Amino acid sequence: MTFYNCRQFSVLASLGYLLMCGFALADTTAETETDGLLPLYLLEVPDSVDDILIADTSAATMHRFVRSDAGIMHEDQRYMSIGQAGAGKEKAWDRKTPLGVYFITESLDTSKLHDKYGAAAFPLDYPNAWDRFNKRTGYGIWLHGVDHNNPQRPPLDTDGCLSLPNEELLRLVDSLQPLVTPVIVARQLDWASPADLDALRLEFRVALDMWRQSLEQGDLVTYLSLYADDFIYRDMSRDDWSSYKLGVFEARQLAGVALDDVLLVADPEVKNLYLSRFTQVLMTDSGPVTTTKRLYWRRSDDRQWRIVSEDSG
């Protein structure tokens, strides 16, 4: 049996499947050279996030990256099954796995679930605000194990969930934090240089800080200028949002606004779409008001950043 170095990246889903089924394979190494590169999606990871999962659906591989004093490091990888119809979910029961940035919401008691979910199960927050913006439907997308009685699953085998071998998922259980651990689901794992990521991060930070300052200063004109014309918040259009925020700004004076635990990521599917997720602390006369927010940003070719959707949680 050949065991692969966890820092070599699988490019053939069939190899992962055969390994899981116990077949011996000849020595094989990936052609992709990633030395010195980082995942394209990870612009800024806060201290509160220790682990990031990135699912490479084209290679049937789940990668785990960890944050360390030395930066973002590739920790390990494992075989994964996705939806029977592949990736790119658009509607309920299309048996596709959604592409995007998601978060684990909770850990379920699998003793109360069907055997097909295996040793552990973690629901993801599909559909998120960006999915709703695009009118995607469906629900019940989980990261889970496999049936103990039928553990050998091909790469395309679920109803849309991400499925890992039980022993592999159990190795991750202690690392998966509800409402903290990001799960980035991509068609393929793309890379960028640290210098390119840092330049983009600084640009993103400028836009985010402009949003924070305008909120803190009660500058409604600047605040609304950061929202795209096609912005949607739940059932609100940009015009509805503007009217709503006018009332909010007039009614509330803030002594300060802090953004903590800032996570900045690039969407794996849509070019120039980015997510900022953070803990927002509003300093009010009656004390601090703390919420977790997500802003989905679109970056134009001339480097203008505009918010297209937002949500809490």
How would you name each of these model-derived features?
Residues 217-230, 234:
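Short, well-ordered alpha-helical segments enriched in acidic and aromatic residues
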Residues 211, 223-224, 241, 297:
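Hydrophobic pocket/interface hotspot
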Residues 24-26, 30:
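Boundary at the C-terminal end of the N-terminal hydrophobic targeting segment
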Residues 96, 246-294:
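Surface-exposed, charged secondary-structure patches
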Residues 33-140, 151:
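Gly/Pro-biased beta-strand-loop elements
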Residues 10-22:
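Bacterial N-terminal signal peptides
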Residues 288-313:
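Short beta-strand edge/turn micro-motifs at domain boundaries
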Residues 94-99, 108-209:
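Exported/periplasmic cell-wall-interacting domains
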